[in-house]
From Swiss-Prot:
Recorded metabolic or biological pathway in which this protein acts: Secondary metabolite biosynthesis; terpenoid biosynthesis
TM annotation in the entry: none
Record-level GO cellular component terms: mitochondrion
Binding site for substrate: R324, D533
Family the UniProt entry places it in: Belongs to the AB hydrolase superfamily. MetX family.
GO molecular function: homoserine O-acetyltransferase activity; serine O-acetyltransferase activity
Annotated site residues (Important for acyl-CoA specificity) in this chain: R290
Stretches assigned to the AB hydrolase-1 domain: 141-406
Region (Disordered), start-end ranges: 1-69, 434-464
Protein name: Acetyltransferase efuC
Amino acid sequence: MSAPRTALSSARQLSNGLIRRTNPRKRFLPLPSTVRSFTNNKPLRSQATAAQEPIVESERPSPVTSVNQPLSFPCLDALDTKTQSLTKQKKSLSGPEPSYAAGETEHFHSASPILLDWGGVLPEFDIAYETWGTLNADKSNAILLHTGLSASSHAKSTAKNPKPGWWEKFIGPGAPLDTDKYHIICTNVLGGCYGSTGPSSIDPLAENNTSSAQKDRYATRFPILTMQDMVRAQFRLLDWMGIDALYASVGSSMGGMQSLAACVLEPSRVGKVVSVSGCARSHPYSIAMRHTQRQVLMNDPAWSSTRGNYYPSIPPHAGMKLAREIATVTYRSGPEWEQRFGRRRADPSKPPALCPDFLIETYLDHAGEKWCLEYDANSLLYVSKAMDLFDLGDEHMRTLDGVRKSNAWKLDGFAAGTAKEEEKAGLCNLTLPDTPYEEQDETSSELLASSPEEAKRARETSSAALIAEEPPEDLVKGLQALSGTPALVMGVASDILFPAWQQREIAAALRKAGNRRVTHVELGEDRSLFGHDTFLLDLEGVGGEIRRFLG
C-alpha cells in the first residue's frame, strides 16, 4: 500500500534537509515528485466542503505581490547622466569631446612623411615633448624618457605647467634622473592624444568639411603602428634637436619596451639602456588582457555605431571606464589589495548591491570614472595594439623589415603629393582567421610530440626554461645589437602584467648575446606589493637603482 502523498512529500523534504546539512559542500537535486494539475483533478472531499462554505470578506486573501523590492542601479544611472550631459554639451556647441591636452608642452612638427612598419604612412606628424635640465655644449648628456601606455610627456612639473608629473619625484636636482647632470626629454608617443599625432588628430589628406570645428580626424583611418614606429618618430625629434647620441634610453612598462627598441634600431646612438617592468616580447596573458579591454571599448554603442568615428558625437565613456577597470586589475597585486581592502564593504549597514559595494569595487569604479574622458578611446586601441605586436625576436624583426621594404615606394608618392586613393585605402587591413582556434583533446606530452618545431618552441618557453634563464635563441639573435650597451633591467615579483620572468629573460638573452655589462634587479614581495605600478611609486627601490646605474 502506497504512503499518503502528504507523508511522502514530508519525508522527501526531511531527507533533502538532512542531506544538505550533512553534506554542506555538495549540491543535490530535489527528489522527483509527481506533478499534480489542479484543473484536471477532482477536488478531495475536504476541498469540496471548503468550497461550499462562504468566505468572510476580511479573510479573503489579498492579491499576490512580490515582497522583494527591485534593486536600484546608481552606477548605471551615473552613466546615463554622463551621456545626457555630453549630449547637452554637443547641442550647446560648447564642444562635446574632452580636451586631451596635458598642459603646456613643446611641439616638434615633421613635414616629411614617415613610413610605419605595417605599411601605413603619415604624410606629416607632430610630437609633443617636455624637457628638464640643461643640454650641455656637446649635447652628450641627453636622456630620452619613454612613457607608459596612457601617460603624457608631463613626467615632471615645469614653469609652464606646474601640475605634478607622473614621475615627479624621480626627476630633479639630486633625483634619480638628476637635472644637475642630465637633460631629460620626454615625449607623448606617436598614436597618443596628448599633443602628438594620433587617431584624434586632423587627417591632412582627408577632404575637410566646411566647418573648421568639424574637420576630418583620422579616427580608424589612422594606420596600425608599432613600438619601433614610435621610437623612429622620437629619433626624428632628436635629429631636429641636433642630438647625435643619447646618454641613456630610459623607460618603464611600455616605455621599457621602447628603451630596448631604441637601442635595437639605433645601437650607435644609445649609450645606456634602462628597462623597468618591461619586456622584449609581449606574452599571451598581457595580449589577452589588452584584447579584452579593446573588445569592451569597441562594443560600447558610441564606438560600434560610428566604427570609431565618434568625434562629432558622444565619446564611448562607458567602454573606456570598463576598459580602465580591467587594466587596473593588472596594474596592482592581490597581496596589496588583501591588505588594503580585504573583504570590507563600503557601507556594511546597507544591504548588498550589484553596483560597487565592496571597497575594492568602489576603488575600481573610481579608477575607471576619473579616466574615461581623460584619454582618447582610439588612442587606447592603437597604442595597446602596438604593445601586443611587440617582439624583438630575430624572426619577427626580419618580417617587419621585409614589410617595410615592400612598402618603401609609398614614401615617394606621399613626398611628391601624388599618393593614389587606392594606395591610401589599403594602409590598414585587419582580417580574421578562416577557422577560429579550438581546444585540443591531446595532453601536454602529445602536444610536445606533435612536431619537432612545436616541441622546441614549447621547451624554450616552458616554466623550467624560464627558471633556468634559458632565453629563446631567436630573442638572443634579436638583441645582438645591445651586446655592447650597458643595461639595467628591473622587475617586480608581484607584477602580473609584466611578470618577473620577462625581465629575467631580457637579462639572460643580453648576457647570452655577449653583453657583459647587464645589471638585473628583481624586487621581491618583501620590498614591493604594488605590482606593475611599482615603477610609479617606489622611489627608493626603483629610483635608487636607476641613480646608481646612471652614475
